[in-house]
Swiss-Prot record:
Gene3D superfamilies: QueA-like (3.40.1780.10). Its EC number is 2.4.99.17. It catalyses: 7-aminomethyl-7-carbaguanosine(34) in tRNA + S-adenosyl-L-methionine = epoxyqueuosine(34) in tRNA + adenine + L-methionine + 2 H(+). GO terms for biological process: queuosine biosynthetic process; tRNA wobble guanine modification. Belongs to the QueA family. GO terms for cellular component: cytoplasm. One of its GO terms (molecular function) is S-adenosylmethionine:tRNA ribosyltransferase-isomerase activity. It comes from Bacillus mycoides (strain KBAB4) (Bacillus weihenstephanensis). Monomer. Pfam families: Queuosine_synth (PF02547). SUPFAM superfamilies: QueA-like (SSF111337). The gene is queA. It comes from the Bacteria. This is S-adenosylmethionine:tRNA ribosyltransferase-isomerase.
């Protein structure tokens, strides 16, 4: 399948550069996955589309301030390091700029020596393996020296780094935020609970592979970067109860979707406690096994994420919705607006 089938025209001014002042005031497009019908709402209206017995699945990963600026100890040359994946102990897979300056044995110093890293090898797609040395607690030092790794299409400086975290972020380890969750406030989550909507939590640590462009000409040639996920026994039990009672499982974001669909694929359609690495790639033709609805942001043209949404509805519905979003001047990408995709007409006719 040609990746150009998932292209659309996006004016640059619709790429959201900063978050809205209030999270839940973002717009919400409600898309019927079967009919393609569209409604234009605001995110707080999600309350009226969720019913008692439904369950939201939220990714409680926390974004690391994963971008570090340092110098080569031997020459003083500036080096930028982006942490991607912790391998074992203090060893990390990273991306480095400029990579050609960092060879095996190169030592990089950060924060006047508060943190040091030695290159111990190469990694996938031009990356480097670094081993860090420090006194104290690594994540406390990272919090002091690191910057939030905002996507390259965001040019503005983020004034408040908490705005690139969900309000329920807990498990540190992501190189990017699960952005569909950025629209929820603690108050909105409480209202959902009072309505009888369940909240289930999983972890998937988002790597840059999620956002890497598809380099192949056809979808089938593209391979996803693996990301770590975890689902507890408590979450699995809650989701299975929801299914047994006739409720809907609605994932908040493509990361939650990938986690549930990975587990269901690996366990004959069942949801159970599991941890591991997933490189699942969902595009039209994929049959969903676990979810009934999806809340997600508006994604980049020709990205694996718009392909996932197209798999859940269909390509024509999704591209029509995206063109409508452009026409109505929705805000796109990480700090942009949201879409709720489900079989809404069926629910109304129950």
């Amino acid at each position: 399948m040609d990746i150009n089938l998932f292209d659309f025209h996006l004016p640059e001014e619709l790429i959201a550069q900063i978050p809205l002042e209030e999270r839940e005031t973002s717009r919400l497009m409600v898309l019927d996955r079967e009919t393609g019908d569209i409604e234009h709402k605001h995110f707080a209206d999600i309350l009226s589309y969720l019913q008692e017995g439904d369950c939201l699945v939220l990714n409680e990963t926390k974004v690391m301030p994963a971008r570090l600026h340092g110098v080569k100890e031997d020459t003083g040359a500036h080096i930028e390091v982006l942490l991607l994946k912790q391998e074992e102990g203090d060893k990390w897979e990273t991306l480095i700029k400029p990579a050609k300056r960092v060879k095996e044995g190169t030592v990089i110093s950060f924060g006047e020596g508060k943190l040091k890293a030695t290159c111990i090898g190469t990694a996938d797609q031009g990356g480097r393996q670094l081993e860090f040395s420090y006194d104290g607690i690594f994540y406390e030092i990272l919090d002091e020296l690191g910057e939030m790794p905002l996507p390259p299409y965001i040019k503005e400086t983020l004034e408040d780094r908490d705005r690139y975290q969900t309000v329920y972020a807990k498990e540190i380890g992501s190189a990017a935020a699960p952005t569909a969750g950025l629209h929820f406030t603690e108050e909105l989550l409480e209202k959902l609970k009072q309505k009888g909507v369940g909240l289930a939590f999983i972890t998937l640590h988002v790597g840059l592979g999620t956002f890497r462009p598809v380099s192949a000409d056809t979808i089938e040639e593209h391979h996803m970067h693996a990301e770590y996920y975890h689902m507890s026994e408590e979450t699995a039990a809650l989701l299975n109860r929801v299914k047994e009672d006739g409720g809907r499982i609605i994932t908040v974001g493509t990361t939650s979707t990938r986690t549930l669909e990975t587990i269901a694929t690996d366990h004959s359609g069942k949801l159970c406690a599991a941890s591991g690495w997933t490189d699942i790639f969902m595009y039209p033709g994929y049959e969903f096994k676990a979810i009934d609805g999806l809340i997600t942001n508006f994604h980049l043209p020709k990205s694996t994420l718009i392909m996932l949404v197209s798999a859940f509805s269909n390509r024509d519905n999704v591209l029509h919705a995206y063109n409508e979003a452009v026409k109505e001047k929705y805000r796109f990408f990480s700090f942009g607006d949201a879409m709720f995709v489900a079989s809404h007409a069926k629910m109304r006719n129950k």
